[in-house]
Amino acid sequence: MKTVFLTGATGNMGWAGFRELYRKRDRFKIRLLARPSRKNMKLLEPYAHDPAVEIVWGDLTDYNDVCAGVSGADYVLHVGGMVSPAADYFPEKTLEVNVTAAENIVKAVLAQKNADDIKVVYIGSVAQCGDRLWPVHWGRTGDPVYASRFDRYSVSKCIAEKIITDSGIRKWVSLRQTGILYPGILKVLSPTAFHVPIQGVLEWATVEDSGRLLANVVEDWVPEDFWNRFYNISSGEQYRMTN
């Protein structure tokens, strides 16, 4: 039975991924890293004594906590970190958390005796390539990284991605996620919504598709040439709805 270490499991994408992985608990042991907040402890309480789930209470910025999660893992799904709108209100903290988390993931993986066998999945962001204003509406994975210097979230994702891909980890992949469409998204009212240019375009990814992605990337049928590449992630043409 393989062990999957998942960070960010209590966030939108991470939770969807965890639920999909949990359906495969007869084949995978699931290890989660979560901050011991009241919200997280309540959310994960039903799994506290589940033999298929191991919860590491800790923080991405603490190397020992990250190492406890990585040790013995076959896959590392690094979804955790600070995202908008919190990232917009706390830009410097976002930079520190997201970069330090990537550094700790790399350090922990390379410290393992079986480091070459551990596959690392990093969740990046299409924000790394900047806004898609006319006439450049189409994004490709080969496009240059072009983050706004004032968008600390985007900058942090660029730096963190480079830390992962240039680390010497033998098998990695960067999945640059777009905006996640999840139930209740319209209830999140924040002035940061106006940071999105009115003439920009966006192809959403549903939270369900995002969860299936995380659960499928750990399957044996994933081809070898999938690894050591960059991918843009979305739910397809039918989700080109709004900016």
Mark where each language-model region is.
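Conserved beta-loop-beta element that borders a ligand/cofactor-binding pocket
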Residues: 161-183
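N-terminal Rossmann NAD(P)H-binding glycine-rich loop of SDR-like oxidoreductase domains
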Residues: 2-24
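Glycine-rich "substrate-gating" loop/helix at the edge of Rossmann-like oxidoreductase active sites
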Residues: 148-151, 178-186, 196-208
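Glycine-rich NAD(P)-binding loop of the Rossmann-fold in SDR/ketoreductase-type enzymes
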Residues: 61, 93-104, 151, 155-156, ...
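Substrate-positioning beta->alpha
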Residues: 155, 159, 196-220
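NAD(P)H-binding glycine-rich loop region in Rossmannoid oxidoreductase-like domains
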Residues: 49-97
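Conserved Rossmann-fold NAD(P)-dependent oxidoreductase catalytic core, especially the SDR/UDP-sugar
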Residues: 100-150
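Mid/C-terminal beta-alpha module of Rossmann-like enzyme folds, strongest
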Residues: 207-243
